[in-house]
Amino acid sequence: MPPVVKRLGRVDYQPTFQAMQDFTASRTAETPDEIWIVEHPPVYTLGQAGKPEHILRDVGIPLVKIDRGGQVTYHGPGQVVIYLLLDLSRLKIKVRELVTAIEQSVIDLLAEYGITAERRDGAPGVYVGEAKIAALGLRIRNGCSYHGVSLNVDMDLSPFAAINPCGYAGLKVIQTKDFNIPLTAHEAGEQLSQHLLQQLDQKNG
């Protein structure tokens, strides 16, 4: 059974994070997988490996410490975030395979618009040249994933300048708008979720 796709619109980060934890903690072997498509109001999230020194200055944006892997990143309007609540044991997918599938979904989406993107060893996410266009972070609990991937579409990128994105000082961050791709965050979410479903179907095939 393919995951149930839920379009939650623009929602605050903290209750969404709590809902992911609650869903994962309460799911059973029969619980259908879900994919949530969201946007968030401005928020920084600090992963388990996050170091306070990667937050360079206070710009009045709230910071939430969370349990995904990785360092600090920014979410805001005009960026699509897709959360993958998957039973990896049931799907027979390893964590590394899921990361690769997520990255490939973004790469395939951008390729449809003539953009050549790539992954990097040891630095999860998707890059165009030297700049990062998508970030990902996951948590696995009892063989089930939550958290997911964010793709910069048409947003104010300036809050990234107040952090070392994903722990990398001076990392340039870009968005699809920079390539004159006529996408809204909503449209990008719809298209990216379809690529994710295709990748998961291939992995599970």
UniProtKB/Swiss-Prot annotation:
Q: Which residues form a coiled coil?
A: none
Which reactions fall under this protein's catalytic activity? octanoyl-[ACP] + L-lysyl-[protein] = N(6)-octanoyl-L-lysyl-[protein] + holo-[ACP] + H(+)
User: At which positions is substrate bound?
Assistant: 68-75, 135-137, 148-150
- Alphabetically ordered keywords of this record: Acyltransferase, Cytoplasm, Transferase
Q: Which Gene3D superfamilies does this entry report, sorted A to Z?
A: Bira Bifunctional Protein, Domain 2
EC class (word):
transferase
Q: Where in the cell is it found?
A: Cytoplasm
The reply to whether Kinase figures as a keyword in the UniProt entry is: no
The EC number(s) this enzyme carries: 2.3.1.181
Where is the BPL/LPL catalytic domain positioned along the sequence? 29-204
The GO terms describing molecular function are:
lipoyl(octanoyl) transferase activity
| One GO location term (cellular component) | cytoplasm
Q: Which pathway?
A: Protein modification; protein lipoylation via endogenous pathway; protein N(6)-(lipoyl)lysine from octanoyl-[acyl-carrier-protein]: step 1/2
User: What is the active site of this protein?
Assistant: 166 (acyl-thioester intermediate)
Protein name per its UniProtKB record: Octanoyltransferase
Species name for this entry?
Answer: Dechloromonas aromatica (strain RCB)
Name of encoding gene: lipB
